[in-house]
Amino acid sequence: EDKGIQRTALWQRGVDTKNFRPDLRSEKMREKLFGKYKDTESLLIYVGRLSAEKQIERIKPVLDNIPGACLALVGDGPYRGQLEKIFENTKTNFIGYLSGEELASAYASGDIFLFPSSTETLGLVLLEAMAAGCPVIGANKGGIPDIINDGVNGCLYDPDEKDKGEQSLIAATKKILADKNKKEMMSKEARKEAEQWDWNQATLQLKKYYSETLGNNA
């Protein structure tokens, strides 16, 4: 509307809730994601492009403060070499690209999905993780708060604090890991939220827009 375009509407993004689902959690996949850190208690995961704008380095203080946690980075990109240096001497496993059911299983097998980027309008990977029943932590900025209900289906951290959200991200991670029952509740709520964003809901919304447009022009 600011550009002079009238009669606009926002069509929600769809996520495949049939392929991304909690029952794909497996010990075999957890072993793959843990790699040589298989004796570690908790599995933190990130899925996506390894690029500077994703601000993945913000996860390092979490590993420094939670010795029992391992990070699996699923994906690849131009920032991988730099990240390997940043995460040197931490329990971080660079997995590379995964796809199909293997990717869906990776989401479902993680304990927490970390999405530190503060520049996202809406992260599809967040919805995929939630569809797989993985509690998520994302930035309290952009479109992320539209899908993360803080303390219910995941947690929000504040990336604009003086420490760039370091303590906020650490606290959110510890909060989820500290309470198994709370974590299981978040997992179920995450799945419920994702179901509101599935392709069936997105299609119904689009059909509604078409019907309203045709009705107004009749």
Locations of regions flagged by a protein language model:
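Donor nucleotide-sugar binding/catalytic pocket of nucleotide-sugar-dependent glycosyltransferases
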Residues: 1-28, 39, 94
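Conserved donor-binding/catalytic core segment of Leloir-type glycosyltransferases
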Residues: 37-54, 60-64
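Nucleotide-activated donor-binding/catalytic signature segment of Leloir-type glycosyltransferases, i.e.
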Residues: 81-101
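Short alpha-helical donor nucleotide-sugar binding micro-motif in glycosyltransferases
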Residues: 97-98, 105-110
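Aromatic "clamp/platform" in nucleotide-sugar-dependent glycosyltransferases that forms part
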Residues: 118
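Short hydrophobic beta-strand element within catalytic cores of glycosyltransferases
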Residues: 135-138, 148
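A short, well-ordered alpha-helix in the C-terminal region of glycosyltransferases
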Residues: 182-196, 208
